[in-house]
Amino acid sequence: VPEGKICQTILELYNKDGIVVEPAGAIGISALEMYHEKFTKKNVGILICGGNNDITRMSEIKERALVYSNLKHYFIVKFPQRKGALKEFVNNVIGENDDITFFEYVKKNNRDYTSAIVGIELKFSKDLNHLTQKMKEFGFFGEYLNDKPETLRFLI
């Protein structure tokens, strides 16, 4: 069962039913949701437990659930080293339903371009193609990080 699916289940149980579960307690429900067709017309028991959950990690759990749901994306974005580049990125690339949730940039002197790590939350997962097309069209696209788990671990 993917880690993101477990995080999604933890959040659903908390938000819908007020149940605080630990990751191990959510695995059974996650597996049942993913493979429900294998359990049709069968009796299934699932143990739900929550004693080993640190509630302060909810933001991390939410982040991983959003990445798993294809709603949160991280990029290396190439910015031209000139005034107005960030404004151009926001005006020409970011959609009205997109939200920049992470931005890390260090200005470098004597370079034509510099890079920023940008996290963007989408309202709809289908908007990812449009977002990356706009980045490429305006020359901002550097690299997509969601498919690089080792790099992504540094961010979430």
Residues covered by each model-derived region:
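Active-site-adjacent helical/loop segments in soluble small-molecule enzymes
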Residues: V1-K41
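A short, charged, Gly/Pro-tolerant segment at domain boundaries
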Residues: A26-I27, I46-N52, E150-F154
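Catalytic phosphate/nucleotide-handling subdomain of diverse soluble enzymes
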Residues: E33-E63
